[in-house]
Regions:
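A conserved acidic beta->alpha catalytic loop
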Residues: 23, 35-45, 67, 92
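Extreme N-terminal starter segment of soluble prokaryotic enzymes
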Residues: 1-5
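Short beta-strand/loop segment that forms part of the nucleotide-sugar
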Residues: 8-9, 29-37, 63, 93
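Catalytic-site signature of metal-activated, phosphate-bearing donor transferases
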Residues: 71-78, 85-91, 97-152
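Acidic helix N-cap motif at the loop->helix transition within catalytic regions
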Residues: 18-19, 40-49, 100-101
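Short, well-formed alpha-helical segments that are part of the catalytic scaffolds
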Residues: 8, 12-27
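Conserved donor nucleotide-binding strand/loop of the catalytic core
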Residues: 43-80, 84
Length: 152
């Protein structure tokens, strides 16, 4: 398991969150959910997911913070949730990583040495179950993995 915390911002993401978290199963040591006071079953799902993750040596911590903006919410999560892993990753609850990327993260991230402090990923955008390969949608390059304490 990689020394990685995945930070996920939520607001009524009960229908998406499980798939996102499960795409990291066995890869991420910790998940931090920063919720904007959901009114669906997001909080209850987080408790359930934490129980499942603890059985494989991972954990999911649920926090709530009032929404101001995306950047403020992410920065609040990075600064107030005691992240102590070497690496952090930002995800949206409606995103998931593919199995080959999960394997690559698990195998390669522990070997990334300083001065590298961030990893850029090529995101695939899907619409109605189909990968949008053209029209400027791929590759969409995003800095998503970063050394903890080196971004905010």
């Amino acid at each position: 398991m990689t020394d990685l915390t995945v930070v996920i911002l939520t607001k009524n993401e009960e229908k998406n969150l499980r798939k996102c978290v499960e795409s990291f199963r066995g890869v991420a040591k910790r998940f931090v959910i920063v919720d904007s006071f959901s009114t669906d079953g997001t909080e209850e799902l987080c408790k359930e997911l934490n129980s499942e993750l603890q059985s494989i040596g991972s954990s999911l911590d649920f926090y709530q913070n009032k929404w101001i903006s995306y950047a403020d919410q992410l920065n609040w999560g990075l600064q107030n949730t005691c992240i102590d892993t070497e690496w952090s990753m930002r995800m949206d609850a409606d995103e998931e990583i593919m199995e080959d990327l999960a394997t690559e993260i698990d195998e390669k991230l522990p070997n990334v040495k300083a001065p590298v402090n961030g990893i850029i990923l090529r995101r695939r955008v899907y619409f109605m179950g189909r990968w949008i390969k053209h029209g400027g949608r791929y590759p969409e390059l995003l800095l998503r993995i970063f050394r903890t304490g080196k971004a905010s």
